[in-house]
Amino acid sequence: MRTDQVPNTTSEHPAIDLSRVHLIGIGGAGMSGVARILLARGKTVTGSDAKDSRTLLPLRAVGAKIAVGHAAENLELAGELPTVVVTSFAAIPQDNPELVRAREENIPVIRRSDLLGELLEGHRQVLIAGTHGKTSTTSMAVVALQAAGMDPSFAIGGQLNKAGTNAHQGTGEAFVAEADESDASLLRYTPEIAVVTNIEPDHLDFFKTPEAYFQVFEDFADRLTPGGTLVVCLDDPGAAALGERAVARGINAVGYGTVDAVAAHPTVPVKATILSSRVVAEGTYAVLDIDGREVEIILQIPGNHMVLNGAAALLSGYLLGADLDKLAAGLSDFSGVRRRFEYHGTVRGGQFDGASVYDDYAHHPTEVEAVLKAARERVDAAGEGRVIVAFQPHLYSRTLEFAREFAGALSLADAAVLLEIFGAREKPVEGVTSRVITDEMTIPVSYEPNFSAVPDRIAEIAGPADIVLTMGAGSVTMLAPEILDRLRG
C-alpha cells in the first residue's frame, strides 16, 4: 500500500469550497449518492461518466449537468469552472483530461471519501464498515431509523428497493453511511457509532498483505469521536478479535451475535444477542435480545448473515436513542437493496414452472457462501427445487488469490455456469481465467466465456421450482432479466 494513496487522517482538513462541484464518474453508486446530497443542499453539481446510464436521468432531473464521455471542456458545464473536482483514484486514470485540466487550472482535486467526510460534518455519524455486508446493514439501519421517525441522511452503495434511491438529505441529526475500506477511505471519517460486520483479507491488490488490511480496521476504531462506540460482530473471528483488542485498549466497544458467539467472547460487552431464527413463509423470523429487551423481527431477505446484519442495524438505532419497537417494525418492512438477493421474477407454467430468478452482488467467497446458503434454506423450506448459479468472477487478482475458496463456496449450489472474469480496473493476466475456479469445483459446472450464451446454458440445466442466481460485481447483473425471459419461453 503506497502512503500517497492513504487519505489524510488528521483531525483537521483543509477547507473545501463545495459551491460548485464536478464529479468524474458521477454515474457510479458512490458518486451519484454524494451528488444527490449536494444537490439537496443547493450546490451546483456537474459531472461526467464514460457512458449513459439509468443513474444519470434522476440526477439531471434535479439539476445536475452531466456529460457522457470525458473531456477537458466538461469542467465548464455550469458556465464557469468548479471550485473542486471529485474523483475515484482507483477507477479514474491520472491522465483523464478533466483531471489534467483541473491541475492546470489549480482546482483542488479530492477523493469521494473527502467529500463524504465534509458532508458528514455536523451530524451524528453512523459508519458501517466490514469486508462484507456494508450495503445491506447500512440500508437496514436507514429503514429502521426512518420507521422510528428520525429521518436520517444517508449514503449507500446500493439502491434501496422501497425508497428507490441510494442517498438522501434528511432533517434528522443522524447521517448513516458506508465506510469503504478498499482503499483505506474509511480513515477519513470520525464516527459516533462505528459498526464492523466482519474482517477477512480482501483488496490485496491495494493493501499487499493481510496484516495491512486488518490494520486499517484498527485505525478506524481509533477514529471514534469522544464517547463513541465501536460495534462488532462476534460471529466473525476478525471483527470479534478487533473488539477484544479495542476493549483491552480502553475503547468503548460492544458486540452482537448468536448465543454461542457471544459466549465465546466474554471480554466484549454484549448489547444484542440473536436468541433464535428460522425460515418462515414470509422470510426469516428471528428473536433478539437488545440490551435486555426481547424483540421479534421478520426479514423479507433470507439468510443467517442477514439476521446478523439486522442485529447490527437495530443496535445502531438503539445506541442513537431511537424507539426499539419502531426500529424492529421498520426492519420487518425492509424489502432489500438492489443487487442483494434481488428478486426478478418467477416462471408460471411450462417446463420451468415455479423457477425463480435472483441477482446478487456477491463477489468474495464468503459472500458467495452466505448467499448460496440462504438460497438453500429457501429451497429446503419449500421442499422442492435446486439452486443454480451463474457466477462472474470479479478482478483477476481476487480470482487467483481465492480460486480454491470460490470453488468451495460455489459448490454449495447444485449446478453452476461460470462466466469469464470481469476485469474492471485490472488488465488481463496471462493464464488466469475462470477455469482456475472450475477445475476445483465438486458440482456439475460449465465454463461459458460467451456472455450472450449464458441464458441458454442455464436453460439446459434448470428445472421446475429451481432458484437461479446471477452473481458477481460486474456485468452479470444484465443477465438476470434475460435468463428469466429465456425460462419463460
From Swiss-Prot:
It catalyses: UDP-N-acetyl-alpha-D-muramate + L-alanine + ATP = UDP-N-acetyl-alpha-D-muramoyl-L-alanine + ADP + phosphate + H(+). InterPro entries: Mur-like_cat_sf (IPR036565), Mur_ligase_C (IPR004101), Mur_ligase_C_dom_sf (IPR036615), Mur_ligase_cen (IPR013221), Mur_ligase_N (IPR000713), MurCDEF_pg_biosynth (IPR050061), UDP-N-AcMur_Ala_ligase_MurC (IPR005758). It comes from the Bacteria. The keyword Ligase applies. It holds the Pfam family Mur_ligase_C. ATP binds at residues 130-136. One of its GO terms (biological process) is cell division. Keywords: ATP-binding, Cell cycle, Cell division, Cell shape, Cell wall biogenesis/degradation, Cytoplasm, Ligase, Nucleotide-binding, Peptidoglycan synthesis. Its EC number is 6.3.2.8. It is found in: Cytoplasm. GO terms for cellular component: cytoplasm. Its main location: cytoplasm. Transmembrane segments: none annotated. GO terms for molecular function: ATP binding; UDP-N-acetylmuramate-L-alanine ligase activity. The keyword Transit peptide does not apply. Pathway: Cell wall biogenesis; peptidoglycan biosynthesis. Belongs to the MurCDEF family. Cell wall formation. This is UDP-N-acetylmuramate--L-alanine ligase. It comes from Corynebacterium efficiens (strain DSM 44549 / YS-314 / AJ 12310 / JCM 11189 / NBRC 100395).
